[in-house]
Amino acid sequence: MEISIPTTLGLAVIIFIIFKLLTRTTSKKNLLPEPWRLPIIGHMHHLIGTMPHRGVMELARKHGSLMHLQLGEVSTIVVSSPRWAKEVLTTYDITFANRPETLTGEIVAYHNTDIVLAPYGEYWRQLRKLCTLELLSNKKVKSFQSLREEECWNLVKDIRSTGQGSPINLSENIFKMIATILSRAAFGKGIKDQMKFTELVKEILRLTGGFDVADIFPSKKLLHHLSGKRAKLTNIHNKLDNLINNIIAEHPGNRTSSSQETLLDVLLRLKESAEFPLTADNVKAVILDMFGAGTDTSSATIEWAISELIRCPRAMEKVQTELRQALNGKERIQEEDLQELNYLKLVIKETLRLHPPLPLVMPRECREPCVLGGYDIPSKTKLIVNVFAINRDPEYWKDAETFMPERFENSPITVMGSEYEYLPFGAGRRMCPGAALGLANVELPLAHILYYFNWKLPNGKTFEDLDMTESFGATVQRKTELLLVPTDFQTLTAST
């Protein structure tokens, strides 16, 4: 019996529909909840016009704290609650210990050989050990105390030099100070082209935020070129590479003691001794890590702390009173003076709760298929932990959107990721290794800014007028620079 073409097509359509229904029923049994999606771009349209961390938080409130997003070609799971954060960062920590490959990592981080982006494995484990024992140990962080104190003092003098009643760009001054601290820690004092180096790093940080087309469509190499990002990153990287090569070539070796060693000294010593298989590019990748990540995160945290204090005069008065009573007119602040300043530490904790420097932490990647909460998670799935949402979860935080340092009084919660409702530096194996250095670079500068000066908004504005709009880059910064008028409080008698 001959079958007509229309009949054949009809049968084909029926078979196709039945097949799709059957496979949909089968495949979706173990898939995570998700918003509605579009072809090709997946769920990206839900995030247009939003800050990524806020957009993802709003989606999670509708679809659950364990949710799937298809970001272009990249299958992504988003965790937005302490419960699921603890699960993926403890029980499944090794499973999600990898990093997804990115265009920035390929070009800027010397093919992902830095600490942050290196794939999980022996090389990364050795780097982590190097950080723990050498580069970012408590002893090494302590060894940079004198330069922190010196650069904080220089900041005070710079602010004083502007004269009374004149607004200053505090954002610019803070970034410059942190960059100088880290530059001296990394390379020593008086390197050539420090400002050029800092500006290039700043440009990379600006280019690496959000969901980039090159990273959500990794297989579409043509898009990487059409977007212009590959060319921009390559250009900046080449300039940075030349600068670092010159710094290394001119760097004096043979420090007389380990306490005098810069971060570059440590890396070159280990490279030359063959204690660790470091290449010249590995050394440069790690140095860029320390400088880039540290500058942006510390300066942003200080800015947000001051912004929140300006908007909360009660807390500003309380922290300044604590500082001024404890120091009792002391001319120069030392880090030892801050050990018992409890409210200052609460202010920093609360700032990190509301404004974690990396609100989506650093994405991880699933190393092997697993089952999470009864859902099938394929290998290579990207993991985002939205610490911004977790830190503002109303189930765990009363008045979660309010700046209230007192919430941490008599609280066992620390910044080191042991309590999963508060994760400013992440948690688990891939937690930020520079937390101790970052905190040291926040606490002392903030103390100087608050101890020596009173602050107000320019042009008669009140605290309600302060713009708190965010800008998403490598970290979440203020969109507008922080312009404030200093009023001298603590009179200085020394000129040095």
From Swiss-Prot:
Topology versus the membrane: Single-pass membrane protein
Superkingdom of the organism of origin: Eukaryota
EC number: 1.14.13.-
Transmembrane segments: 3-23
InterPro entries documented for this protein: Cyt_P450, Cyt_P450_CS, Cyt_P450_E_grp-I, Cyt_P450_sf
Reported cofactor(s): heme
Subcellular location: Membrane
Predominant location: membrane
SUPFAM superfamilies tied to this protein: Cytochrome P450
Protein family per UniProt: Belongs to the cytochrome P450 family.
Name assigned to this protein: Cytochrome P450 71AV8
Species the sequence originates in: Cichorium intybus
Lineage: Eukaryota, Viridiplantae, Streptophyta, Embryophyta, Tracheophyta
